């Protein structure tokens, strides 16, 4: 009888210890996520940059892993892609180069269309642009008025978005490597997120499309200055081609999507 009682006491002790340890680990993981989100909030609070020409006066993060052949240059890139069955069907891409030395912003707007049935019908067009007084203007004449208006009205999320609102989602996972300062955020966003609303309105994406987000970059998470940022939105609807929006701000290195 005594041995039986000791057995149950030991079992109860093991269960209690397991609960305490598991609870402690859960709280530690939750606290770490809160801490990382607070750090990312400091980084994302430096946006929006409504006037791209203010980047002339902003220093970036020199990544020692990159060979900087093009010093003191910001690269801003965005792309809207339609992907079906692992193949690119359509892509609109804007790339701007912000030269801090010459105080000039130049770049191009590219359009790519691939025909599923006939590869010879695929098209690629590029339109050189520059930024003057925070407005995108063409360096060559564009005859299509709709396309011209679309490009001239182009805005990046770093200009018009609410990036800190991404952190309001309860379905996010954040990781950070303090030895390299690389971080990664991934998860789902609701249709109420202002960035999701803006992109769906801009690109006529179905309202019921689910949205996944991924944010990659390099930062000490103290918000001291602008760092390399790469932002991805994945929109999916049953029976529809996937839509991907990408945007990046990088210093002295062209983003590699």
UniProtKB/Swiss-Prot annotation:
Q: Does the record carry Cell inner membrane as a key word?
A: no
Location(s), subcellular: Cell membrane
What is the similarity comment for this entry?
Answer: Belongs to the staphylococcal tandem lipoprotein family.
Can you say what this protein is called? Uncharacterized protein SAS0186
- Keywords for this entry? Cell membrane, Membrane, Transmembrane, Transmembrane helix
What are the annotated GO cellular component locations? plasma membrane
Topology term for the membrane: Single-pass membrane protein
The protein's matches in InterPro entries, at most eight in alphabetical order, are given as: Csa, Csa_sf
Q: Does the keyword Cell membrane apply?
A: yes
Membrane spanning residue stretches: 6-26
């Amino acid at each position: 009888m005594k041995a039986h009682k000791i057995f149950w006491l030991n079992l109860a002790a093991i269960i209690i210890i397991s609960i305490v340890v598991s609870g402690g680990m859960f709280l530690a993981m939750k606290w770490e996520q809160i801490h990382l989100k607070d750090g990312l909030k400091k980084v994302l609070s430096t946006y929006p940059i409504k006037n791209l020409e203010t980047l002339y006066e902003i220093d970036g993060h020199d990544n020692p892993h990159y060979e900087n052949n093009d010093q003191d240059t910001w690269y801003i890139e965005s792309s809207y892609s339609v992907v079906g069955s692992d193949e690119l069907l359509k892509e609109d891409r804007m790339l701007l180069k912000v030269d801090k030395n010459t105080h000039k912003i130049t770049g191009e707007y590219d359009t790519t269309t691939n025909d599923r049935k006939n590869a010879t019908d695929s098209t690629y067009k590029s339109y050189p642009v520059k930024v003057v007084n925070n407005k995108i203007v063409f360096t060559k004449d564009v005859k299509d008025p709709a396309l011209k208006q679309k490009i001239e009205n182009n805005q990046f999320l770093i200009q018009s978005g609410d990036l800190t609102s991404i952190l309001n989602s309860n379905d996010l996972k954040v990781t950070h490597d303090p030895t390299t300062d690389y971080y990664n955020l991934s998860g789902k966003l609701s249709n109420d997120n202002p960035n999701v609303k803006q992109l769906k309105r801009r690109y006529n994406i179905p309202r019921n499309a689910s949205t996944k987000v991924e944010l990659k970059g390099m930062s000490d998470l103290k918000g001291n200055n602008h760092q390399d940022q790469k932002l991805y939105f994945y929109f999916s609807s049953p029976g529809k081609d996937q839509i991907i929006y990408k945007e990046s701000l990088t210093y002295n290195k062209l983003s590699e999507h």
